[in-house]
Regions:
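Outer-membrane beta-barrel strand-turn architecture
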Residues: 80, 139-141, 155, 167-171, ...
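Short glycine-rich, acidic/polar surface loops and turns
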Residues: 387-389, 415, 425-430
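Bacterial N-terminal signal peptides
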Residues: 23-35
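C-terminal outer-membrane beta-barrel translocator/porin domains of Gram-negative envelope proteins
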Residues: 97, 114-119, 136, 246-406, ...
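N-terminal targeting leaders of membrane proteins
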Residues: 38-118, 252, 270-273
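Gram-negative/organellar outer-membrane beta-barrel architecture
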Residues: 109-282, 363-364, 376-381, 438-440, ...
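Small/polar, glycine/serine/threonine/aspartate-rich low-complexity segments that form flexible
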Residues: 123, 411-422
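Short, positively charged and aromatic/hydrophobic N-terminal segments
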Residues: 14-15
Length: 462
């Protein structure tokens, strides 16, 4: 071995000796200081529920008595949450243990990670479930862009399709996007315009919609949307579901007091015979002080949308629609437990003597607007709904919400606001999400006046 190698070896050994010696000194000092600090601490006090291991028995802690009443009041809610989340947690444990998600993602995603195929499914009580596939692509239209195609089937009479394209990159202050939708269902629900009735019926819809928008974000908190839309919607008698007859047997034309089956009365169901064919332009403003919209965040949210629609073909209607929303999320504990309060309202204003098509009227009874009632069961010229919702985390990327709604439907310009009945519903929902999109949600809601239990579950691709 050369002299230079011996010198280098000796120098390395000496440096190693210094490191080991220094580490031993530091460890010894920490042990001494730790022993001194422990010697200065008073012994555990059993009267305060303290133990020698430093823990405090919750049952013996003074705060335990104060929490007894809230725990008792929340016991039914906690039990319901546990019942709903139990299968989800069991499934989550199985998925995590066997790496099911990673395997499925790898099998349905291209090697670049920006394109892939995902399953989608939706189910709501009293409606046919749908299932299909969604293709997503964040590469073809350019870096940060989005291309999505969705197709779902229920049966031969239920079909949904969607094609969405956003060529602009995420994060730009100006965004543009296009969307094409196709919907064919024969189990749509209608029970009249005005207060919910017992004359429940089903109708079929065959609709094609083309939508485009330009979105400006001058600041992080403010967004401005300019949108255009054209649609063709055709209606027909539906399939008897849950004992609800086709619409032509319920809201029919009467001659000499007798119902003429399969001929829908246009006075009771405006636009059914002509269809809803329109061109629409919209302007929307959104103010959102929350950092992100889906994860629990405190802040203020306000929105205003005004659109104008003009019919074509057999649809001669012309009308404005106005939507407003105000909400606030209050931080109850560590930014993860929130109380969300919001009020939202819709109204339409016809500009001629042609009634607004029934399908374009404001409705309540939807996943995000009084889900305790049949979808579209509360319908009129204007609607107003107030919601109180409590949200809290239950698992990584998942949260639960307990909500109560109070709302109603009214005639033009809310003219009968004081005299019309309002409706209550309560519900519980579990949501699995990313920072910007729901992956899966499941919930149960109950409509107090005239409604019933409504169960919904759904999932889609990111």
């Amino acid at each position: 071995m050369s002299n230079n190698a011996l010198v280098a070896l000796r120098a390395g050994a000496y440096d190693l000796h210094l490191v080991i010696a220094g580490s031993v000194r530091i460890l010894f000092a920490l042990l001494v200081l730790g022993g001194w600090a422990g010697a200065q601490e008073p012994p555990p006090d059993p009267t305060q529920g303290e133990r020698s291991d430093g823990r405090i028995d919750a049952d013996d802690h003074p705060a335990a008595d104060a929490l007894a009443v809230p725990r008792l009041l929340l016991a039914p809610v906690r039990g319901l949450v546990y019942a709903l989340s139990f299968p989800v947690r069991g499934l989550a444990d199985f998925v995590e243990t066997h790496h099911v998600i990673q395997w499925a993602v790898d099998a349905t995603t291209f090697s670049d990670g920006k394109r892939g195929i995902r399953p989608n499914f939706d189910y709501s009580s009293h409606y046919a479930p749908t299932a299909g596939l969604t293709y997503f692509d964040h590469k073809t239209l350019g870096p940060g862009s989005e291309l999505k195609a969705r197709f779902a089937l229920g049966d031969a009479r239920v079909m949904e399709g969607m094609l969405y394209a956003r060529p602009t990159a995420t994060g730009r202050r100006v965004q543009t996007d296009l969307r094409f939708d196709y919907l064919r269902r024969n189990d749509m629900y209608f029970d009249g315009i005005g207060p919910p009735e017992t004359h429940r019926s089903r109708y079929a819809i065959n609709a094609v919609t083309l939508w485009g928008g330009v979105h400006f974000r001058p600041t992080r908190l403010l967004a401005i949307d300019l949108e255009g839309e054209t649609a063709w919607k055709h209606f027909a008698g539906g399939h008897e579901t849950d004992g609800n007859l086709p619409i032509g047997a319920v809201f029919c034309v009467h001659i000499f007091g007798r119902c003429v089956t399969n001929i829908v009365d246009p006075k009771q169901v405006p636009g059914f015979d002509t269809g809803a064919n329109y061109e629409r332009a919209a302007l929307a403003l959104r103010l959102d002080t929350r950092a992100q919209s889906l994860p629990p965040r405190s802040g203020f949210l306000a929105g205003l949308r005004v659109d104008y629609s003009h019919g074509y073909g057999g649809d001669l209607s012309s009308y404005f629609r106005v939507f407003g929303l105000v909400g606030v999320a209050v931080n109850l504990w560590r930014g993860s437990h929130l109380l969300v309060l919001r009020v939202q309202g819709w109204m339409v204003e016809a500009l001629n003597d042609i009634p607004v098509p029934f399908s374009e009227l404001p409705v309540l009874g939807a996943l995000d607007a009084m889900p305790g009632y049949h979808i579209g069961s509360i319908r009129d010229q204007s609607t107003l709904i107030a919601t109180a919702e409590y949200r809290w985390p239950i698992w990584m990327y998942a949260d639960a919400s307990l909500f109560v709604d109070n709302g109603g439907a009214y005639v033009r310009n809310f003219s009968d606001f004081g005299s019309r009945a309002r409706y209550w519903d309560v519900g519980l929902a579990l949501r699995v999400r990313t920072d910007s999109h729901f992956l899966f949600r499941i919930g149960l809601a109950y409509g107090v006046e005239g409604g019933d239990f409504q169960f919904f579950v759904g999932g889609d691709a990111p």
